[in-house]
Swiss-Prot record:
This is Putative pre-16S rRNA nuclease. It is an enzyme of class 3 (hydrolase). Pfam families: RuvX (PF03652). One of its GO terms (cellular component) is cytosol. Its main location: cytoplasm. It comes from Vibrio vulnificus (strain YJ016). Belongs to the YqgF nuclease family. InterPro entries: RNaseH-like_sf (IPR012337), YqgF (IPR005227), YqgF/RNaseH-like_dom (IPR006641), YqgF/RNaseH-like_dom_sf (IPR037027). It comes from the Bacteria. It is found in: Cytoplasm. Could be a nuclease involved in processing of the 5'-end of pre-16S rRNA.
Amino acid sequence: MSRTIMAFDFGTKSIGSAIGQEITGTASPLKAFKANDGIPNWDEIEKQIKEWQPNLLVVGLPTDLHGKALETITPRAKKFAQRLQGRFALPVELHDERLSTTEARSELFSMGGYKALSKGNVDCQSAVIILESWFEAQWG
């Protein structure tokens, strides 16, 4: 049985999301949720989770280039993951998101130039990259 996985790219102002199927290992961007100092509108996230009914949530874990925690944002991303798990009673995994934003900007620019580089687009594409990277890690 293939699982549906939803991923989040946590940020203090915007949280990107993506959805994917384990059987295909591919992901598609969904929505960027505005956040107020890292706190999203939980009702909007709940609506999306009810609509897509994922079996698992993956949250990008921000680290530096060497995989070390970043002082301010890493603990907040972990807290967001804990809140997702507590609110929605779904399993949540953290996944390294190193360079996902850089890669997202590059992919979006190649598809649509500067116009494609809106904050929401970048955050959702980052969530796609996080999820596809998570799929790759599962398959070794």
